[in-house]
UniProtKB/Swiss-Prot annotation:
Keywords: Cytoplasm, Elongation factor, GTP-binding, Hydrolase, Magnesium, Metal-binding, Nucleotide-binding, Protein biosynthesis. Residues 10-204 form the tr-type G domain. It comes from Haemophilus ducreyi (strain 35000HP / ATCC 700724). Monomer. It catalyses: GTP + H2O = GDP + phosphate + H(+). GTP binds at residues 19-26, 81-85, 136-139. The gene is tufA. This is Elongation factor Tu.
Amino acid sequence: MSKEKFERTKPHVNVGTIGHVDHGKTTLTAAITTVLAKHFGGAARAFDQIDNAPEEKARGITINTSHVEYDTETRHYAHVDCPGHADYVKNMITGAAQMDGAILVVAATDGPMPQTREHILLGRQVGVPYIIVFLNKCDMVDDEELLELVEMEVRELLSQYDFPGDDTPIVRGSALQALNGVPEWEEKIIELAQHLDSYIPEPERAIDKPFLLPIEDVFSISGRGTVVTGRVERGIIKSGEEVEIVGIKETTKTTVTGVEMFRKLLDEGRAGENVGALLRGTKREEIERGQVLAKPGTITPHTDFESEVYVLSKEEGGRHTPFFKGYRPQFYFRTTDVTGTIELPEGVEMVMPGDNIKMTVSLIHPIAMDEGLRFAIREGGRTVGAGVVAKIIK
């Protein structure tokens, strides 16, 4: 069969496997690629190809992640699988692999285990919007009642963390048997793929979201006014549109009178492009790096929030010593550092390098933020942690 050219016509969706160690996440990943390659074309990936995950760096943090891709009838999927629990924690917190939905793998022989719970909690904290459950190793359980019990436990656990436990699709399967080509278990992989297609909605593309541009630089051009530059994070900006300048100071409104790229005037700037935006009647000293330009009413400035944080280990270039409550590092959002203080959960006295922890942060200046915004924690310009805004307080 000749190689077909890659069709970009199908919607692209990012997913990943999560769940307890040895419950079969990597075997399932291999089974999905193998079974779907048979049915819809594409490349099958062997277990050891996936398990031997290459190291990547995201925000200075080393993460082992395997990336595979596969097709269903209607979609193209990019799928991440991590070998170790620590890699999952880092991946989810840094957003290195943003997931539109996750496949939670639970071994029917064990039921939910500590990391099952932790991955669901992390999913909730970092904003994984949809979870589908694959109940694995069902070939090793003869007792229908036991399967029903495990299923009930998983649904309760999901509901506990505000996922719709009662409505979550659960597929009973055996990744190993499917990988070995046993037809009845291959069917279960097809069933899982159908749930991926129907249960996870098509993600909104960055370009369709409301306009946002983090300001990197501000210039004053004589006779023309003030220009801010940066990379458009989402949406589209057209000349003549009104925008808000949000963060650090009081929110103000202005009009974009021109958009340029490489000194050429454009009709519009789009998500992913580095542009300069000329602002009407705004003085150079009224704007600074760290603020954002945004479509009016779409983002607000905040100082206090709950976050989920991963603290770099000494080996990753992080701190060599723990920190305690009252710790005052810099929090790096988009383009700028803001000093903040932290509060630790009740009963937690200190945080060790290599830990992940829920902490409440209070910044000295407000920053334009939404839940799900990623940040780095820095001391004197060196990254010592990575986090995500889980819940805005004020």
